[in-house]
Swiss-Prot record:
Cofactor, free-text remark: Binds 1 dipyrromethane group covalently.
Single GO biological process annotation from the record: protoporphyrinogen IX biosynthetic process
Further information: The porphobilinogen subunits are added to the dipyrromethane group.
Top-level taxon of origin: Bacteria
Pathways per UniProt: Porphyrin-containing compound metabolism; protoporphyrin-IX biosynthesis; coproporphyrinogen-III from 5-aminolevulinate: step 2/4
Pfam entry (one): Porphobil_deamC
GO molecular function: hydroxymethylbilane synthase activity
Keyword Calcium: no
UniProt entry keywords in alphabetical sequence: Porphyrin biosynthesis, Transferase
Annotated Gene Ontology cellular component terms: cytoplasm
PANTHER family on file: PORPHOBILINOGEN DEAMINASE
Gene designation: hemC
Protein name: Porphobilinogen deaminase
Subunit field text: Monomer.
Length: 306
């Protein structure tokens, strides 16, 4: 039997993730595989903010097209980049155990967010992060920061930015110290993106190895990530909207925290819901309803103007 082909983006972090799945496939599923690098729309267009490029699946669409053609057998994604609605015939075969879900502040000069001078320039790719930064510091100048992790760090070190915000999971996976000052925000300080810290493996549901990859699935992480994805789906949102959502389990209880707002931090809804694990999806719907009643759809319409 030939090797399975893993589709992956070409960045160092994406290849770390693909190799992580490759090793686990061999060790736990006894399946040999090889990696094929694929350039996505998000990789090709680096001179514009992600929300200006338009469309959903900026980092997944080309990989999904190759899955549907049968050119690759599976695609490894950062789960936060995976659209909540799949192309017909595709689905997640597994969601891996979550790494650190937090966002991290990095600076060469300033120890934390509150020590930044007035009007400081902060780099981030994410409207979600911009919105939450502006909630804390309206004066900050949040600017688009594109490129891989190393490119972003070089922009910080060259003085282009006073600080940047990156995902802690990516820094840990690449074993990067980052900068002189590095401080992770708590989930309460900055609510992460849906699925942040987890990897999603996408395949054709009809693929003969689809079920076998369930061995790589982490039940608790998958449960929480599906709750988060359900919330985003209810907003009819994609990966580039200013929404943070995080679900966590505490024994037989679940807590879901969410925030949505304009990128300038002017109109923001923040709520949380706690409930029984066995009624967790009902809790998501109740939280979603509370957001919609508070004007979530109207805010998302205004986001298009930014």
């Amino acid at each position: 039997m030939g090797k399975l082909v893993i589709g992956s983006r070409g960045s160092e972090l994406a290849l770390w993730q693909a190799n992580y799945i490759k090793e686990r496939l061999k060790k736990e599923c006894f399946i040999e595989s090889e990696i094929q690098i694929v350039k996505t729309t998000g990789d090709k267009i680096l001179d514009a903010p992600l929300n200006k490029i338009g469309g959903k699946g900026l980092f997944t669409k080309e990989l999904e097209e190759l899955l549907l053609k049968g050119t690759i057998d599976l695609a490894v994604h950062s789960l936060k980049d995976v659209p909540v609605v799949f192309e017909k015939g595709l689905d997640l075969a597994c969601i891996t155990k979550r790494a650190d879900v937090r966002d991290t502040f990095l600076s060469t000069k300033f120890p934390d967010l509150m020590s930044l001078p007035k009007g400081a320039k902060v780099g981030t790719t994410s409207l979600r992060r911009s919105m939450q930064l502006k909630c804390k510091r309206k004066d900050l100048d949040t600017e688009s920061l594109r490129g891989n992790v190393q490119t972003r760090l070089k922009k910080l070190e060259s003085g282009e930015f006073d600080a940047i915000i990156l995902a802690e999971a990516g820094l840990c996976r690449l074993n990067i110290q980052g900068a002189k000052y590095r401080k992770a925000f708590s989930v309460e300080e900055m609510i992460p993106s849906m699925g942040q810290g987890a990897l999603g493996v996408e395949m054709l549901k009809s693929h003969k190895h689809f079920t076998a990859l369930q061995k790589l699935n982490d039940e608790e992480s998958a449960f929480c990530c599906h709750l988060e994805r359900e919330f985003i789906k209810g907003l009819n949102g994609g990966c580039q909207i200013p929404v943070g959502v995080h679900a966590s389990l505490m024994g037989e209880k679940v807590k879901i925290q969410a925030i949505l707002g304009l990128p300038n931090g002017e109109e923001v809804i923040a709520k949380e819901k706690q409930g029984d694990k066995n009624k967790a999806f009902d809790s998501v719907q109740e939280l979603l309803e509370a957001f919609l009643q508070s004007g979530a759809r109207e805010i998302l319409e205004k986001v298009q103007l930014f």
